[in-house]
């Protein structure tokens, strides 16, 4: 199980996040995620997805359900405590032969349980991985653009630490345990 501590500028509360992937077959797995808000002691998110990887296309597709009191980096729904159905897709294009620089397009759509409220997201990003940036230190830099919100974003990852920020001033920090 993967666990992390997360703190976002808009939440003012530390969250504990856990994720487990259970392999169904070679390229398919069942993924369960959950989050706990340490300020309220209540669940802040949860999801269950079936994800399939298409190795010939360097792409993934996921279908499942999710529950979020607050969706990704500060994007909120009108009513926050509904179950939502979700579809996710991602395609990676290597930019360099060594695979350290990639261009990725990704998208997703959530719909509430009554099929009345839709929320789409999608974007494109460049990712650059630098192994052994310094001794025992790997770094990843992502620069992208979220198309539906029309906002550029940045991610810097160093071993267990990840910092995310966007042009609207939203940010969060994650530490993987």
Swiss-Prot record:
Topological domains (Chloroplast intermembrane): residue ranges?
A: 32-55, 92-97, 131-137, 163-168
InterPro entries membership: OEP21
Q: In which tissues is it expressed?
A: Present in roots, shoots and leaves.
Membrane topology reported for the UniProt record:
Multi-pass membrane protein
Q: Decide whether keyword Ion transport is in the record.
A: yes
| Cytoplasmic topological intervals | 1-21, 66-81, 108-120, 148-152
Q: Where in the cell is it found?
A: Plastid, Etioplast membrane; Plastid, Chloroplast outer membrane
Alphabetically, which GO biological process terms does the record hold?
Answer: regulation of monoatomic anion transport
GO CC annotations on file: chloroplast outer membrane; etioplast membrane; pore complex
> Can you tell me where the transmembrane regions are?
22-31, 56-65, 82-91, 98-107, 121-130, 138-147, 153-162, 169-177
Q: Which UniProt keywords are present, listed alphabetically?
A: Chloroplast, Ion transport, Membrane, Plastid, Plastid outer membrane, Porin, Transmembrane, Transmembrane beta strand, Transport
Q: Name one GO molecular function term.
A: porin activity
| Highest taxon listed in the record's lineage | Eukaryota
**Functional description taken from the UniProt entry:** Voltage-dependent rectifying anion channel that facilitates the translocation between chloroplast and cytoplasm of phosphorylated carbohydrates such as triosephosphate, 3-phosphoglycerate and inorganic phosphate (Pi) depending of ATP to triosephosphate ratio in the plastidial intermembrane space; in high triosephosphate/ATP conditions (e.g. photosynthesis), export of triosphosphate from chloroplast (outward rectifying channels), but in high ATP/triosephosphate conditions (e.g. dark phase), import of phosphosolutes (inward rectifying channels).
Family statement:
Belongs to the plastid outer envelope porin OEP21 (TC 1.B.29) family.
Q: What is this protein called?
A: Outer envelope pore protein 21, chloroplastic
Instruction: Write down the species.
Output: Pisum sativum (Garden pea)
């Amino acid at each position: 199980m993967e666990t992390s501590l997360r703190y976002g500028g808009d939440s003012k509360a530390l969250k504990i996040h856990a994720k487990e992937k259970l392999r169904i077959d070679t390229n398919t797995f069942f993924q369960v995620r959950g989050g706990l808000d340490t300020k309220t002691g209540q669940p802040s998110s949860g999801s269950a997805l079936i994800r399939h990887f298409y190795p010939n296309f360097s792409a993934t597709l996921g279908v499942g359900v999710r529950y979020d009191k607050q969706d990704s980096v500060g994007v909120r729904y009108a009513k926050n405590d509904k179950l939502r159905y979700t579809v996710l897709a991602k395609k990676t294009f290597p930019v360099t032969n060594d695979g350290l620089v990639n261009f990725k397009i990704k998208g997703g759509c959530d719909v509430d349980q009554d099929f009345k409220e839709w929320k789409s997201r999608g974007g494109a990003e460049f990712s650059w991985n630098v192994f052994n940036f310094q001794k025992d230190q790997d770094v990843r830099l992502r620069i992208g653009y979220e198309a539906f919100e029309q906002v550029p974003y940045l991610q810097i990852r160093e071993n267990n630490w990840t910092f995310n920020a966007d042009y609207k001033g939203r940010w969060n920090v994650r530490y993987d345990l």
